[in-house]
Amino acid sequence: MKALLLEDVRKISIQEYPEPPKKDDHIITKVNAVGICGSDLHYFSEGGIGSANVGSGFVPGHEFSAILMESIPEMNLEEGEHVAVDPAKPCFKCQWCKKGYENLCPYVEFIGAPPFNGAMAQYVSIKKHQIHKIPKHFSPETAVLLETLGVALHAVDLS
């Protein structure tokens, strides 16, 4: 598959990259659209954010929509459906996750944040709980914006 790789500060390229391996608790998705977040710009222009430094060969991108490469019967999702993806993979074991505050998980793995490669690739492996069905009239580009919309709505809720 092809992927966009950050090779160094201000240096990117599109290269052949290994397809994600199939894992029991993951679904392979075909990336449909990817947004460019401010964090992606920091990774490109500065090589990281704080202690989150990207190395050579990092694939950015956490705001994305995808096409399912297989059905998920328990979620009533069919192969080929367009979905939105939550880039956060909380542990579901810590005190915060057990209380329902997965957003506070100190062990969260975040697609597209070092050291976890992102969605600027043709395929991404994600856990089922990260997949969200979207209305058929949503374009792939609209679905990309759902992650940022969620952040904004959460900020409004807290205000």
Go through each PLM region and give its residues:
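Extreme N-terminal starter segment of soluble prokaryotic enzymes
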Residues: 1-2
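N-terminal glycine-rich cofactor-binding segment
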Residues: 5-22, 38-71, 84, 105-117
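A generic structural signal for well-ordered coil/turn residues at beta-strand boundaries
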Residues: 13, 23, 79, 119-120, ...
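Glycine-rich beta-strand-centered segment in the early N-terminal region that forms part
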Residues: 20-34, 49-95, 130, 135-137
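Active-site phosphate/pyrophosphate-handling residues
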Residues: 26, 42, 63, 144, ...
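Proline-glycine-enriched beta-turn/loop adjacent to the NAD(P) cofactor-binding site
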Residues: 34-35, 149
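NAD(P)H dinucleotide-binding glycine-rich loop of Rossmann-like/cofactor-binding domains
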Residues: 91-159
